[in-house]
Amino acid sequence: CEQCGPQDAEQFVFGQLAFGFNHLGHILLRAPSPVLLCASHGDFFPFSGVLETAGRAADAYRMLGAEGAFALSDTIGPHHWHESTRTRAVAWMNRGLQGGADLGPMQSARNLQFGFDDARVDTGLGFEPRDLQHMRTNAWAATVTPTGSTLDLPGARTVYDLMKDEAEAARAARPTLTPGRVREVAGIGAATFEVCSPFRADEVDWAVLVRGDGTPIPVATVGAGAPALVVSDAADRRTLAPLVARLVADGRRVTVADIRGFGETAKGRHAFYGVKDGDEEIAQLNGLVGVSLVGRRAEDILAAAAYAGGGRPVELVACGRAAVGAAHAAYVGGKALFSGLVLEAPPPAWGALFADDAKPFRFADVVHNAWRFYDWKDLCKNLSNSH
């Protein structure tokens, strides 16, 4: 995480760091079955970590009496399926499946291809377009099925088809939903906070609500009248000026809060593969330790509502992707804390993701295991007025 941030979804197991499952754990899940660990020196992860993982895995295999069943294949160069890596992988599979010869030491020079013609020999420093050309001119060598697609086989089903079936079965078996259940599933804890650095300037009251875990929630309040709370996925609260002006004109005292991962609290160390929503890194880091960001955002909104209302219920206005956390907060807070819920341009329901596999989703907008109990839009039925 220090090097480059969280990685692909298949490498992400919710709560894995909380229960001690790391890179070594992936290897040990297979032990004592044969495992070849392939790595490039210039890959995303520091190579020193690869060596540490390989050393510990080798020790574990040795303790299990399967010393020859684990090996490391490393090569110079960046993230890529290099020729030397492919050569060793084929040799490894040959040994395991066809009784081929032993590979020898973990780092074997005979598996590295050397030469002076960089158009023909892999230096380990880049991609190999000649291989792509070979596949184009020899299409038969690149396909196993008659058409080149397993989806053309009789009875073939995609992973999306399987997910839809599982999702429908889970939806049909849902128990009765309660605020307590939502708190438990989303991990919504106490909404404690302290008001820090309050000041007034240009008829706006400014403050920072410091949550119990130290997270700062910047808030700005303007106007007079019945309290309203605005939360948004906007990077700059100034884009909310027309909405705030309309609410103030309607006789509202409006508080705008930057809940975690949005606005002033959005900046992380790394962009998640360049995704425009910077809170993906925050969501994955939370998920690695078993925390859903949606639940934490709901806590932030509950705290901001208590601050904005001063003992009175507030109207909650949620814009964009902030609607998911707002729906959770409104459901568990109820009418004692919220007089209404208005959703401006909210994201689709979670169920829409199963209906259309082309729709993107964000780790930041989902709650782990929640589908077995509810869809996030189920939480809005009593209070909401979507636009």
Task: Please name every model-derived segment.
Residues 1, 306, 323-335, 341:
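Short glycine-enriched nucleophile-adjacent loop
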Residues 1-12, 16, 57:
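Beta-propeller blade termini and top-face loops
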Residues 1-7, 25, 313, 326, ...:
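Serine-hydrolase-like catalytic core of hydrolytic proteins
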Residues 4, 31-33, 38-218, 222-226, ...:
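Alpha/beta-hydrolase-fold serine-hydrolase catalytic core, especially in secreted/extracellular enzymes
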Residues 15-20, 368-371:
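Short gly/ser/thr-rich secondary-structure transition/capping motifs
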Residues 74, 321-322:
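Long hydrophobic segments that form regular secondary structure
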